[in-house]
Amino acid sequence: MATTSATSTVNTSSLATTMTTNFTSLLTSVVTTIASLVPSTNSSEDYYDDLDDVDYEESAPCYKSDTTRLAAQVVPALYLLVFLFGLLGNILVVIIVIRYMKIKNLTNMLLLNLAISDLLFLLTLPFWMHYIGMYHDWTFGISLCKLLRGVCYMSLYSQVFCIILLTVDRYLAVVYAVTALRFRTVTCGIVTCVCTWFLAGLLSLPEFFFHGHQDDNGRVQCDPYYPEMSTNVWRRAHVAKVIMLSLILPLLIMAVCYYVIIRRLLRRPSKKKYKAIRLIFVIMVAYFVFWTPYNIVLLLSTFHATLLNLQCALSSNLDMALLITKTVAYTHCCINPVIYAFVGEKFRRHLYHFFHTYVAIYLCKYIPFLSGDGEGKEGPTRI
């Protein structure tokens, strides 16, 4: 009887332990399921800064150290390449436009301002390289953070406005060739460029104020910092403004302009007019190819709580997509000089003349064998 009682006690204890374990597993499963239905939230150490610093709705933490680590290891090297090639290319564009093409019409003025916009953006890249490489530890002070963020957005908006104005300029030149001559003068060009930069600066004013703050550990983070009571409202309004100005507005204007231009060229084919719009058309297409993916992913990242119900793993994938598309978008600032060299016939001719006149002479002076007329030069050998 004693043995039976002991066995019964052991079985009861084992059954209780099993039931407790199963109940704990079930409770854990339920909590996990409920948590997965709630939108995830970003860690304060996330990579995304400035344009793409997305703060998800209040929920259980969703840490994404893999994205942060990848950004710190890869992005600074890519930004360095973009900085070097972009700086060289856009400086060449500025020199050639001023030295050879002359600032005598609206088109050349806008091309010059487009290069200056790219240069302004490029000059901020070394700071972002350092910031990302240091895992978001800003060491240059809050004032410089605000200034550089504002300059970033101002260069983006001025670039968009310049491309829009180049499209409108081509539209006027093709559709209203004679009438447009009154508006495509140097004076109108100067007024247009001044208004462009003023409007870009005005639209960038919030970025000069709502960036840079010090966390509880004393670290300065150069990220968007909005009033606590309405952080999500400010952030969504900011992203909506960026997407409207950098994607929707230029897309609508350029679609209408090129629709009318193509209809006119189909009715009255003109090789000269075709050449006149080819360069600007390629510049426009390149802009959308590089910036559209980023804008779409940014939209999903910001409004995903309303549009989608993402689990942490899917949210991490979205952040990785944001990292990739942002890097591609930043690469655009070194693309325009390449387009000019391959598509712009006049630019290519002036570029060749510049290298032949200034670069080749110095290379031959300091590297004699490049000139092909050294002392040991021999005549052709006859067989």
Swiss-Prot record:
GO terms for biological process: calcium-mediated signaling; cell chemotaxis; immune response; positive regulation of cytosolic calcium ion concentration; positive regulation of monocyte chemotaxis. SUPFAM superfamilies: Family A G protein-coupled receptor-like (SSF81321). It is a multi-pass membrane protein. GO terms for cellular component: host cell membrane; membrane. Disulfide bonds join C145-C222. Signal peptide: none annotated. PROSITE patterns: G_PROTEIN_RECEP_F1_2. This is G-protein coupled receptor E1. The chain crosses the membrane at residues 13-35, 78-98, 109-129, 160-180, 190-210, 242-262, 279-299, 323-343, 351-371. It is found in: Host membrane. Keywords: Disulfide bond, G-protein coupled receptor, Host membrane, Membrane, Receptor, Transducer, Transmembrane, Transmembrane helix. InterPro entries: CCR1-9-like, Chemokine_CCR1, Chemokine_rcpt, GPCR_Rhodpsn, GPCR_Rhodpsn_7TM. GO terms for molecular function: C-C chemokine binding; C-C chemokine receptor activity. Belongs to the G-protein coupled receptor 1 family. The gene is E1. PANTHER family: C-C CHEMOKINE RECEPTOR TYPE 3, CELL ADHESION MOLECULE.
